[in-house]
């Protein structure tokens, strides 16, 4: 394995698109991951991400899909950010300033507090709130912006 690459916080939708092979977005996600093969990104998650990903497989009793998510969340080298009071304080400020939904504000606050280089999302409001604070890969636009 090569040197460690950038630190990336994938929004829940990115993981769902990737693991469920969403025909609209999976190619853009794989293209973004491909240059990282020599220096793979460190993916950062929270228990909120894990919870959101596991809901549908549990509702539909899809044990194969559930196991796939559980494998990702137990991959060595990936990190879990603790949701501390400080993370929630930042999330509260982001929610108040940008009108984010609570989970999106928590995701962005976790990405910022864990020192991520990029957040990957499909959510325009989340991307706008993240702009200027962290690199943003907007899967819809298929580009990364740093400001």
Please identify what each model-predicted range represents:
Residues 1-7, 35, 79, 108-147:
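Acidic, PIN/NYN-like endoribonuclease modules and their adjacent C-terminal/linker elements
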Residues 1-45, 58-67, 138-147:
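Short, well-structured N-terminal submotif of metal-dependent ribonuclease cores
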Residues 14, 49, 87, 107, ...:
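Alpha-helix capping/helix-boundary segments
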Residues 26, 50, 66-69, 88:
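A general structural signal for well-ordered alpha-helical segments in protein cores
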Residues 21, 49, 75-97:
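Acidic catalytic patch
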Residues 60-81:
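Helix-adjacent hinge/juxtasegments
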